[in-house]
Amino acid sequence: MTPRIPPLPPEQWPPEMNEALAALRPPNPRHPFPPRDPSRPKGLNILGTLAQHPELARAYHSFNGHVLFASTMSPRQRELLVLRVAHVRGAEYEWSQHVIQGRDAGLTDDEIVRIHTGPEAPGWSTLDRALLTAADELVADARISDGTWLALASELDVRQLMDVVFTVGAYEVLAMAMRSFGVELDDDLPPGRKSPSP
């Protein structure tokens, strides 16, 4: 795939991109920021693409910073939703980056493989199954069905229910952007992180 919007290398990022990156860090995080590790993929292709429009990047990062670091859901629950959206949408970049974050959040390799099958795969807890079903329903219909809502509401509070919807929405938008802009996988992505097409 050839990028429709070529990513800017970091040395060409406009100064406003620093504000956009800072917006990823909410003032009251509930979850830790990822460790600074030079061996981890840096996501330069998506960040370099967003650097073409730093005002948009800042606005999206403020929203995404909540989803990643201030959400009332656990990181594991968040990553179940993100990876399911990435798989259903065929968003290889999103999938590849979030396999790493999913493992950091406690997802096992077996669970990551089962995300491809979805909520009907054996072995999910009732809540995990409801989260995956909610992701599928939101992507397909922009609405969580009554049955799935009841299953979620039996274990999640109001803020968590809201965070479910906004997490799926955040990564649905990002999947659309990455696929439409033609964002390519980064060279520093370790082998075996790529998702087969849905």
Regions found by a protein language model. Name each.
Residues S125-V165:
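Acidic/histidine-rich alpha-helical segments that form the ligand environment
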Residues A151-A153, Q160, G169, V173, ...:
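Acidic, carboxylate-rich catalytic segments that either coordinate divalent cations
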Residues M1-T2, D37-P38, E55-Y60, G90-W95, ...:
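Short acidic alpha-helix initiation/capping motifs at coil-to-helix transition points
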